[in-house]
């Protein structure tokens, strides 16, 4: 029996994990084992919202060392993380400034400024990327305007997964799928767009040309002295999650559900027409030259903040209490900028309901019900937008990632969208990370080949839409999910 042992480092906005995958070639069997799980979160430092990258690096190394201590031969390592954020380095490879997080307010007003100065349509035609106030282009503009004293010291700008790969190998890389999230990559050339870079204030010399997933960046030397290849996987966690989504046919959509919810479909060509621009659709890079045509939805970030503020530890009990409440009494727009990082999420949700003359969610369960119903309705709205964009309805929706364990939200999504939902795999980003490693090791042919492995080994659950549910009646009552957006705008 031939085995491959691959390690995936998967960092999310709220937690990180080091996972060991064991692939058996003859039976095409893939098993995962968690080696080390650790917390991640936002920190306040010198007036900025930041990431503790030193703590994350220590946790990554701890996890890798644990594998080596077990005497396991590691064939390769891959790292995926969230997008848009970066670390600046000087000529000696030392950090310049702070690793500021995308939820920091330093970019306020800069997106509108860019649209006014460069033209919204021109930016979109160049990048194909949706307008989000924290995109890297606006973060760099904020840095170069607000901290010009740092500029002479900057030699390199590395996105978060590339930074950790650099820390392991000493080699720099700019991986394509994550680079596209910056809104700085030209959609036609797959290279940095000089006009957009110039507006950001960044120097093109800070960046190397983006490379597609599947190349070996360098090697990590383990404590035992072995050199282990570090592979450039699809380093944006959503790109990895999509690779592991067992999409079957052209009418399948995906929803990567976690702190963020990313809903979309795969395409061989980008969508940058006026309809896509009006809907704020993004065309992020995927594996094998595919585009991830999708839209960002605020996701379970709202719930995470409520759990934190109300000090709720028993999530299953909360979901059970939530399920007992009537649907659609409290509806908000989860994508409103007011929910990006408010001082108090509970108060912000209540204020949004008050301002739209709705009942006010007071209890823990009412707040959760508000979030779940609002997300499900927004999912339906976005799915409708995506279907209109491509001119064809979807037949099924694959929900992957940690959020797919929320059976209540899965069923609400199926009911609101009127579509069959297939939930799983939970560790989609990790699996997609492993998939690219196995392709790089010549164990698998391509993404479709890997998806067959996922389909046969992952635990998948199907949710059938119930047209008689409260949320389905709510959607039918307003006749079109497009109106939902207006109701909660």
UniProtKB/Swiss-Prot annotation:
InterPro entries tied to this protein: ATPase_NBD (IPR043129), FGGY_C (IPR018485), FGGY_N (IPR018484), Rhamnulokinase (IPR013449)
Active site (UniProt): 237 (proton acceptor)
Gene Ontology molecular functions: ATP binding; glycerol kinase activity; rhamnulokinase activity
UniProt keyword list: ATP-binding, Disulfide bond, Kinase, Magnesium, Nucleotide-binding, Rhamnose metabolism, Transferase
Alphabetized Gene3D superfamilies for the sequence: 3.30.420.40
Residues that hold ATP according to the record: 13-17, 259, 304, 402
Catalytic EC class: transferase
Cofactor: Mg(2+)
E.C. numbers: 2.7.1.5
Name the record gives this protein: Rhamnulokinase
Organism: Escherichia coli (strain UTI89 / UPEC)
Lineage: Bacteria, Pseudomonadati, Pseudomonadota, Gammaproteobacteria, Enterobacterales
């Amino acid at each position: 029996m031939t085995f491959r042992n691959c390690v995936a480092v998967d960092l999310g906005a709220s937690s990180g994990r080091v996972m060991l995958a064991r692939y058996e070639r003859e039976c095409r069997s893939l098993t995962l084992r968690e080696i080390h799980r650790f917390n991640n979160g936002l920190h306040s430092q010198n007036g900025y919202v930041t990431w503790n990258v030193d703590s994350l690096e220590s946790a990554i190394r701890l996890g890798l060392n644990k594998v080596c201590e077990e005497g396991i031969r590691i064939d390769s390592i891959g790292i995926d993380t969230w997008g848009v954020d970066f670390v600046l380095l000087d000529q000696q490879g030392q950090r310049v400034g702070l690793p500021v997080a995308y939820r920091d307010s330093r970019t306020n007003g800069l997106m509108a400024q860019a649209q006014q100065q460069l033209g919204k349509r021109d930016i979109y035609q160049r990048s194909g990327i949706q307008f989000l106030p924290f995109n890297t282009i606006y973060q760099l503009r904020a840095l170069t305007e607000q901290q010009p004293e740092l500029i002479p010291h900057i030699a390199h700008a590395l996105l978060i997964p590339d930074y950790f790969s650099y820390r392991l190998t000493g080699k720099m890389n700019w991986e394509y799928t994550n680079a596209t999230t910056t809104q700085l990559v030209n959609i036609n050339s797959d290279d940095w767009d000089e006009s957009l870079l110039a507006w950001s204030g960044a120097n093109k010399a800070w960046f190397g040309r983006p490379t597609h997933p599947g190349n070996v960046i360098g090697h990590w030397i383990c404590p035992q002295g072995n050199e282990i290849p570090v592979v450039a996987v699809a380093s944006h966690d959503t790109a990895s999650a999509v690779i592991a989504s067992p999409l079957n046919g052209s009418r399948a959509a995906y929803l990567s559900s976690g702190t963020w919810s990313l809903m979309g479909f795969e395409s061989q060509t980008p969508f940058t027409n006026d309809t896509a621009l009006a809907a704020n659709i993004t065309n992020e890079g995927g594996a094998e030259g595919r585009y991830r045509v999708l839209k960002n939805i605020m996701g379970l970030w709202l719930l995470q903040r409520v759990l934190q503020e109300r000090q709720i530890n028993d999530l299953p009990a909360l979901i059970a209490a939530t399920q007992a409440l009537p649907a659609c009494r409290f509806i908000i727009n989860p994508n409103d900028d007011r929910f990006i990082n408010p001082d108090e999420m509970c108060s912000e949700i209540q204020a949004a309901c008050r301002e739209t003359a709705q009942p006010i969610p007071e209890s823990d369960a009412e707040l959760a019900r508000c979030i779940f119903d609002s997300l499900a309705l927004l999912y339906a709205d976005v799915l409708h937008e995506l279907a209109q964009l491509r001119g064809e309805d979807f037949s099924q929706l694959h929900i992957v990632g940690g959020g797919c364990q929320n059976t209540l939200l899965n069923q609400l999504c199926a009911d609101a969208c009127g579509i069959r939902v297939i939930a799983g795999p939970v560790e989609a980003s990790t699996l997609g990370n492993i998939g690219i490693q196995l392709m790089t090791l010549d164990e698998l042919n391509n993404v479709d080949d890997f998806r067959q492995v996922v389909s046969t080994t992952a635990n998948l659950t199907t949710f059938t839409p119930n047209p008689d549910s409260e949320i389905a009646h709510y959607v039918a009552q307003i006749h079109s999910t497009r109106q939902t957006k207006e109701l909660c705008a």
